[in-house]
């Protein structure tokens, strides 16, 4: 049966290859989380021979796969649009969703390719800070940022009490009135001078602009002045008015409770603190350690009595004892002993045996004897035992049975031996040698059989061990 050539799954000549690259920052879909961040870019197949022939025209004779012509082209050359001669058979919806490659007939979604239209500025450049002059900024702010602000101009300076001046109401201008809400009193509304009906005040305004009638905006303003709420907190150096939330009755009560609680932790109220177990290291030559030792020695010196300050014991019967001692004279023998060498702490501790210290007496070890060699044999002298049997060898010889020793071969030959005795002695020697040969042959055969048996057991053991390996 003839072998049929199998059609390849991918035809290399008609196949289209792609490069998987990151999506461009100027692509509008780069900020879309649902769109893939990597796209496919089709590779451009160029014939190597044609490319090399084109390179030779421009004087490039390198024989490698690199395209040197890309450096010779103009970066922004003229572009020409050539319309397609074959009309598209796909609908507009199909063009948006898929991309068709006629060489393979494979349809891929458009989301896996880069967008056709790109923005002029990428996402990273949009997020970068803008440098240069900003025309949309206030000129005064720009001048202050550029250090062109005139601090010597009195109009640019603020008064020390600008907060108080800003909080004082003026007669000719409109005044903002604050009205507490019925629920919690923290809602305020802006009211004009003419809208007196909205605030519920019944008193008329005076000509001088003085608002003193009960229920008037002036009286409402006095209840909520800024400097009345300026109260420092014990917990921080900031005031309560620096809080974002306006302080109503409940918040004020909450603040007062906190202030009362923190009064217990003032410097004058804090008592002795608990002793904390601190661990650490300190240098031996530290000044702090030296001060502590000096204080300790001073305290001990005050509580102890020195020997040179001892006073004699005052006896009450001193007068009577002096009379008796004057009558009796005693001879006292004073023995002066030589001062012994005292042991210090280090020498005492050195007598204790531990893992690293093994105290013992230092002994004088004599030098080993020098080894002398024999001039004849080269063997060390006085090393090998002397000739003759040792005591152990003599004891072993006595334990040997005399029947096991050869009889004829060890018997001395007498000088007065006759021919018959000589013939009998030689015949006995022959018989003894014959028995010795038989015994030697039997021993050799026994050793040979034992060697075979042991080799067979060793082979079986080796096979069993190899069979147990995993």
Swiss-Prot record:
Bias type Basic and acidic residues, positions: 414-437
Region (Disordered): 23-54, 75-103, 166-209, 399-437
One Gene Ontology term from the biological process aspect of the record: ribosome biogenesis
InterPro entries per record: Ltv1
CC per GO annotation: cytosol; nucleoplasm; nucleus; preribosome, small subunit precursor
Entry annotated with the keyword Phosphoprotein: yes
Keyword vocabulary terms for this entry: Coiled coil, Phosphoprotein, Ribosome biogenesis
Phosphoserine PTM positions: 17, 24, 243, 326, 403
The keyword Ion transport belongs to this UniProt entry's keyword annotation: no
Residues in coiled coil: 414-470
Superkingdom of origin organism: Eukaryota
Free-text function comment from the UniProt entry: Essential for ribosome biogenesis.
Family, per entry: Belongs to the LTV1 family.
Protein name: Protein LTV1 homolog
């Amino acid at each position: 049966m003839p072998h049929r050539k199998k059609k390849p799954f991918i035809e290399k000549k008609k196949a289209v290859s792609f490069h998987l690259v990151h999506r461009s920052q100027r692509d509008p879909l780069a900020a879309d989380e649902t769109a893939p961040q990597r796209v496919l870019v089709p590779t451009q197949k160029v014939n190597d021979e044609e490319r090399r022939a084109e390179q030779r025209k421009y004087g490039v004779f390198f024989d490698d796969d690199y395209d040197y012509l890309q450096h010779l082209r103009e970066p922004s050359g003229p572009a020409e649009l050539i319309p397609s001669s074959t009309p598209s058979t796909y609908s507009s919806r199909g063009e948006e969703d898929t991309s068709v490659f006629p060489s393979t007939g494979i349809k891929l979604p458009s989301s896996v390719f880069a967008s056709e239209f790109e923005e002029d500025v990428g996402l990273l450049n949009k997020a970068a800070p803008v440098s240069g002059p900003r025309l949309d900024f206030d000129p005064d702010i720009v001048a202050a940022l550029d250090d062109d602000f005139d601090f010597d101009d009195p109009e640019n300076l603020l008064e020390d009490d600008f907060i108080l001046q800003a909080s004082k109401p003026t007669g000719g201008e409109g005044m903002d009135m604050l009205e507490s809400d019925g629920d919690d009193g923290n809602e305020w509304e802006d009211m004009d001078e003419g809208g007196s009906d909205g605030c519920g005040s019944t008193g008329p305004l005076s000509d001088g602009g003085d608002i003193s009638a009960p229920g008037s905006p002036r009286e409402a303003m006095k209840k909520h002045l800024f400097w009345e709420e300026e109260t420092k907190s014990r917990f921080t150096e900031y005031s309560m008015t620096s809080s974002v939330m306006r302080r109503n009755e409940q918040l004020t009560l909450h603040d007062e409770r906190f202030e009362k609680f923190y009064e217990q932790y003032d410097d004058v109220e804090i008592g002795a603190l608990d002793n904390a177990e601190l661990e650490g290291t300190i240098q031996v030559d530290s000044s702090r350690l030296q001060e502590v030792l000096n204080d300790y020695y001073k305290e001990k010196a005050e509580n102890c009595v020195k020997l040179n300050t001892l006073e004699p014991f005052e006896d009450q019967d001193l007068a009577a004892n002096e009379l008796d001692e004057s009558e009796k004279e005693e001879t006292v023998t004073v023995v002066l002993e030589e001062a012994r060498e005292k042991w210090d702490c280090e020498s005492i501790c050195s007598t204790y045996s531990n893992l690293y210290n093994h105290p013992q007496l230092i002994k004088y070890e004599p030098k080993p004897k020098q080894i002398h060699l024999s001039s004849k044999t080269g063997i060390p002298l006085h090393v090998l035992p002397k000739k003759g049997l040792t005591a152990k060898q003599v004891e072993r010889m006595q334990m040997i049975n005399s029947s096991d020793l050869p009889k004829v071969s060890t018997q001395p030959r007498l000088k007065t031996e006759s021919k018959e005795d000589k013939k009998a002695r030689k015949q006995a020697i022959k018989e003894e040698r014959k028995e010795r040969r038989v015994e030697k042959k039997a021993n050799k055969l026994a050793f040979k059989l034992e060697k075979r048996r042991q080799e067979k057991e060793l082979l079986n053991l080796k096979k069993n061990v190899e069979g147990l390996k995993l």
